[in-house]
Amino acid sequence: MEYMLTRLEWLVGPDKIQTLKDTSIALFGVGGVGGGALEALVRAGVGRIVIIDGDSIAPSNLNRQMITTHDTIGARKVEVAKARALSINPDVVIETHDIMYIEEKYPGFIQSLNVDYVIDAIDMVTAKLSIIEVCQRESIPVISCMGGGNRFYPEKLMIADVNKSHTCPLARVMRRELKKRGIKKQLVLFSTEKPTKPQFRGEATSPGTCSFVPPVAGFILAAHVLRTILEVSEQ
C-alpha cells in the first residue's frame, strides 16, 4: 500500500526512512529561504523540526515565502509554518520558538534543542554569527545561508566553505567577522551572481527579491542536510 514516503522509500530504502524519522533539525528563519527548507524537510519525513522565527507575515512576503497566503497575513510565522507542516505530514513533531535569537539574550538555547543539524536561514548578521559560534563550539553541524536578495539566477547558488565564497556582500562580511572570532571554516550557501542594482527603491531598506531564488536556496540547504543524514554520495 502506498503512503506519503513510498516514492522516497523506493529511492533510499526502508532503513533510511527510519533514519529520517529519528532525525531532529533546527531551522532558524522560516521566510523565503527557510520556508523552502521547511517544505523539503517535512516532505522528506524528518521526524522532528524545531522552527525559530520571531516575525509575523506581511503582504510583501507573498511574492516568495511558501508559508504565506492572503489568509495568513498578520499571523505569526512560526504558527503558520507549524500548521502547514502538520497539514503535509501529521506525524512530524514541530516545536516552535517565536523569538529573534541571539546567544546573549538566550544563553544555552541551541544546546537545549537537542538537534542533529542546524540550518541558518535568517538575515541578521549578529544572529548568524551567534548560531555559528555556538554550533561550532558544541560540535553541532550547521549550514548558513548567505545573501539571496537582488538576484535572478538560482542556478548560481552553490555550497562551499565561507572562505571560498565570493561575489556575495553578506558572505564578505561573514568571512571578516568569523575570522575575528577565530572561526576558520564554515559551510555556507552563497550565490556567484553579482547582485542586481534595484530599479526602484521607494522607502525600501531591504533588498529586492523574486519568487524563485529564496525558495530554491531553501531547497538546496535542505538537500545538503538530508544527503548528509542519509549518507548519500555522488555516483
Residues covered by each model-derived region:
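Glycine-rich phosphate/adenylate-binding loop
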Residues: 111-117, 122-127, 134-138, 142, ...
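Conserved S-adenosyl-L-methionine
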Residues: 42-48, 137
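Conserved N-terminal Rossmann-fold NAD(P)-binding element of oxidoreductases
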Residues: 27-29, 52
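N-terminal charged helix/coil linker that caps or initiates catalytic domains
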Residues: 1-25
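Hydrophobic/small residue at the entry helix of a nucleotide-binding pocket
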Residues: 33-34
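Glycine-rich phosphate-binding loop and adjoining beta1-alpha1-beta2 segment
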Residues: 46-89
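Conserved SAM/SAH-binding loop
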Residues: 98-106
